[in-house]
Amino acid sequence: LALGQAIIESGWGQSRFALEGNALYGQWTTNEQRGLIPEERDDDKTHAVLKFDSLKKSVQAYMHNINTHGAYYSFRVVRRIAERVQYTDPISAKVKFLAAYAEIGDEYVDKLELIIESNKLRDFDRFEY
């Protein structure tokens, strides 16, 4: 799931935000000093995309966001239930609750499901190191 989101948000690591700011997940900030201003940002918008000193810090910030922000509360509840009942495809159960992650909402969910499926990212679901 996290790999799929990084692929989408960073354009396979090739976006300006990934290359200049180690930003894999497109997280927003209202502090322009801490981020990169999107080139095509609407005039009425004030956000920037958070930049990081390392890819590791980008991943850590994403994990903190997904595990604490109120917008992803339902995602966390479903994740907990899927783990307890050992749901056979926990990614499918969880991904539906990530529409709030992107401005495009349900289209983002569809895109994420396609990326996960077409790149066999489920193979990494139980990865241990």
Describe every region a protein language model picked out.
Residues L1-L3, I8-Y129:
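Catalytic cores of secreted/periplasmic lytic hydrolases that degrade extracellular macromolecules
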